[in-house]
Design a protein with these regions (language model features):
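Tandem amphipathic alpha-helical repeat scaffolds
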Residues: 5-9, 34-44, 70-86, 110-125, ...
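Helix-turn-helix DNA-binding segment
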Residues: 415, 464-467, 473-544
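Residue signature of alpha-solenoid helical repeat architecture, marking inter-repeat boundaries
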Residues: 27, 34, 63, 67, ...
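Alpha-helical segment of the N-proximal tetratricopeptide repeat
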Residues: 1-25, 35, 117
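Generic long, charged, amphipathic alpha-helical segments
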Residues: 360-426, 469-480
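Amphipathic alpha-helical segments of tetratricopeptide repeats
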Residues: 17, 24-25, 54-65, 78, ...
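Single-residue signature of alpha-solenoid repeat helices
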Residues: 16, 49, 89-90, 128, ...
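Residues within the DNA-recognition helix of helix-turn-helix
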Residues: 52, 442, 517-520
Length: 544
């Protein structure tokens, strides 16, 4: 048993599985069932894991190990609710866990885990926060860092959702620091903390924070096999926002495969994000196929509205966004409004302007400005400045240039290249009459950004604007300049003779991601193999 537990703690699920299966072949016990269940969970075999936790529960009850039975019951509750979405089953198993712990009459760390699950079920934000703070206190009292930092990470997410963004992100940072320092015993706890962190960063478009922690935690994530399907989906969303679309596609497709293998009913998380990527790329038919059947999914609202707008179906986008952002245009922002509604309002401004409803666009832009002021994050600040600038351009009055400059600065700070390029395009429109040379420069910069991102539809719009300004538009192969920043890094490492695994170690990316980048580099540069890539890099260095 000790060998199996040690294997679990170092993340070696296959070794642990062999140990516990061997133990169960000799005698069935709660400890062996629970150990095998944890190994199955780490291998993403969620249905089998839940089944073996149930068996562990029954065995512990027979053995009259009350605290262990309560632990098994709350874990079944966790898996059935969070993985399979079976809320009634989750409630039943959680009630069983609470009853057993009450029956045992002991003060133990298990009460902390139960409080965490209760927080997931609690709709009221204040009550949820209270449960989590109590769980943190229990973890500290018993010296159980898994409880303490899991609850701390989740509390950070709750604070972000209630617009206490900076306070919440500091808590998630602390939980990640503990995970990276090796303070946590359970691989599943580390997994969940990373998933919560990626979800939080995606929610507020905090690309720099996600990027820093990915570098800091690269070794841990590889060693302990941390990135599960939900993590990959959220990380793919962050990579999409960061303009690293090739990497995003790899993560999202891998996430879909993970979901298909372990929990196909929850694959909407990756499908919605992949659909968002396709809209940005201008691959609208593929996006529509990915969103088929997800019309009522709350996470699909923004992507679906963006798809409608891109297809010229502004009325459908308007109806959807108005329903999902219903509220006062004049009142004080409600709790959680900036985090959840802000991005939808930014898109609604585009929809109203497309319909030439400038008055409605201005009302929404003003509402967006109020909630951006409440959150004070760079993304919403930039989105509000862009919306105000767009309204100024549409009205032909106001200081559009100043607003758009502010948006450019904030989008650059947030490391959001797609939004940065769109703002440059708006700047070109704003200055077309008064400063045509500056407008041409802005449009050219936008076109280059869109081409680098491979955002075909937006690149066409930028090219058309340049032509209308009387500027020549370059066509044909772009050579080395068409490579993304990451592809250029990969090319340089190929050029010095590194293998794919060596490149992956150097850049903290997976071997599959390296293969994807190498294939793109060869295709873009018209090269047939790595030897030609080495020769290409050598020629480039010689010509400088």
């Amino acid at each position: 048993m000790d060998d199996g537990v040690a294997a679990l703690r170092r993340g070696d699920a296959s070794a642990a599985r062999r140990v516990f299966e061997s133990a169960l072949a000799e005698v069935e016990s709660g400890e062996a069932f629970e150990g095998l269940a944890e190994a199955l969970y780490l291998e993403r075999e969620y249905a089998a894991a839940a089944d073996h936790y149930e068996r562990a529960y029954a065995a512990y009850r027979r053995e009259r190990q009350h605290m262990a039975a309560g632990r098994a019951a709350r874990t079944v509750s966790w898996i059935t609710g969070n993985v399979f979405g079976d809320w009634a089953v989750r409630i039943g198993w959680l009630a069983r866990a609470r009853a057993i712990l009450t029956e045992a009459g002991e003060d133990s760390p298990e009460h902390g885990w139960v409080l965490i699950i209760r927080a997931f079920l609690e709709p009221d934000a204040q009550a949820r926060e209270a449960f989590l703070r109590e769980a943190i206190a229990i973890g500290r009292r018993f010296g159980d860092p898994d409880i303490e930092f899991y609850a701390l990470s989740y509390l950070g997410g709750v604070l972000v959702m209630t617009d206490r963004v900076e306070e919440g992100l500091v808590l998630t940072d602390e939980a990640l620091a503990a995970a990276c320092a090796g303070e946590l015993a359970e691989v599943a706890t580390v997994d969940s903390i990373f998933c919560g962190f990626f979800w939080t960063c995606e929610l507020v478009n905090d690309v720099p924070r996600a990027d820093q922690w990915m570098r800091a935690a690269a070794e841990l994530m590889q060693r302990r096999n941390v990135v599960a399907a939900f993590c990959r989906a959220h990380y793919g969303g962050i990579l999409t926002a960061a303009g690293r679309w090739d990497e995003a596609e790899v993560q999202l497709l891998e996430s879909t495969r993970h979901f298909d293998r372990g929990m196909p009913e929850r694959r909407a998380a990756s499908l919605i994000r992949l659909a968002d990527l396709r809209v940005r790329q201008g691959r609208l038919e593929e996006s529509a196929m990915l969103l088929d059947g997800l019309d009522d999914h709350p996470d699909a609202v923004r992507t679906l509205a963006a798809l409608y707008l891109a297809r010229g179906e502004a009325a459908l986008a308007q109806d959807l966004l108005e329903r999902c952002t219903a509220g006062s245009d004049d009142g004080v922002p409600t709790v959680g409004e900036s985090t959840m509604v802000g991005p939808l309002l930014a898109l609604l401004v585009d929809v109203y302007l497309e319909a030439d409803n400038v008055d409605a666009a201005e009302r929404i832009a003003q509402r967006l400005a109020r909630i951006a002021e409440a959150q004070r994050g760079p993304y919403l600040k930039a989105a509000a400045a862009l919306a105000k600038g767009q309204v100024c351009v549409a009205r032909g009055q106001g200081d559009a240039r100043s607003c758009l400059h502010s948006a450019l600065e904030s989008f650059a700070l947030a490391q959001l290249p797609m939004e940065l390029a769109q703002t440059r395009l708006e700047m070109a429109r704003a200055l077309a009459a008064s400063s045509p040379q500056v407008a041409i420069a802005a449009a050219k910069a936008a076109l280059e950004d869109f081409e680098r991102l491979k955002a075909a539809r937006h690149a066409d719009v930028a090219a058309a604007l340049l032509r209308s300004l009387g500027a020549p538009v370059r066509t044909g192969p772009k050579g080395h300049g068409a490579l993304t920043k990451r592809e250029t890094e990969v090319l340089q490492l190929v050029g010095v003779g590194l293998s794919n695994p060596e490149i992956g170690d150097r850049l903290f990316i997976t071997r599959k991601t390296v293969e994807h980048h190498v294939g793109n580099v060869l295709a873009k540069l018209g090269l047939r193999n790595r030897a030609e890539a080495v020769a290409y890099v050598t020629r480039e260095k010689t010509s400088r």
